Design a protein with these regions (language model features):
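Enriched for short, Lys/Arg-rich terminal
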Residues: 1-5, 11-27, 31, 52, ...
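A short, surface-exposed loop/turn module that caps and links secondary-structure elements
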Residues: 34-62
């Protein structure tokens, strides 16, 4: 099975810089991204789920505690678009 292609948005790049400034352990984020890249799924510990409302086409998972990752996922074309990362208050 082929792995997913990872694309990132400008917002994700900005959010990543904020996470770096906060001293968050980015290796945790990179582990989640690598797992998603392999087959588009995550272990239950990350509580991955689809969002609703304005975010109906997006997925969210908990990297650690209140640190979230939001992405779009196209399973037909094997593409993941990393949209944003941060706390609930940062993102919603």
């Amino acid at each position: 099975m082929s792995s997913y292609t990872i694309l990132i948005t400008k917002r994700f790049e900005k959010d990543l810089e904020i996470c770096k400034k906060r001293g968050l352990k980015l290796s945790l984020l990179y582990t989640v991204i690598e797992q998603l890249k392999l087959n588009g799924t995550l272990p239950k510990q990350y509580r991955a789920h689809k969002l609703s409302g304005n975010y109906a086409n997006y997925w969210e998972c908990h990297i650690k505690g209140d640190w979230l990752l939001i992405w779009e996922q196209n399973d037909d074309e094997l593409i993941l678009i990393l949209t944003s990362t941060g706390t609930h208050s940062d993102l919603f």
